[in-house]
Design a protein with these regions (language model features):
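Intrinsically disordered, low-complexity regulatory regions
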Residues: 1-75
């Protein structure tokens, strides 16, 4: 199985949090961005554009955190 596919045959359903675990996402800002992107505009509270803005902000925060750490940690 390649790195883009995960075996979920034993699971009844897969939520966003399971996806983050399956793909070994360790960064909280990146996990937050992924959740925003997967459900952009579909949660009722915020529109599509606002979710994209917030996902971008989370990614920018991850990059800022990487800049604070030397040498850069390639995740």
């Amino acid at each position: 199985m390649n790195h883009y596919f995960k075996d979920v045959q034993t699971l009844k359903s897969v939520d966003v949090y399971r996806v983050l675990v399956l793909f070994d996402v360790k960064s909280h800002p990146i996990g937050h961005a992924i959740k925003k992107l997967l459900c952009a505009g579909k949660r009722g509270a915020k529109d599509y554009r606002q979710d994209l803005i917030e996902a971008k902000a989370s990614i920018e925060r991850e990059l800022a955190m990487m800049d604070e750490e030397e040498p850069h940690d390639v995740r």
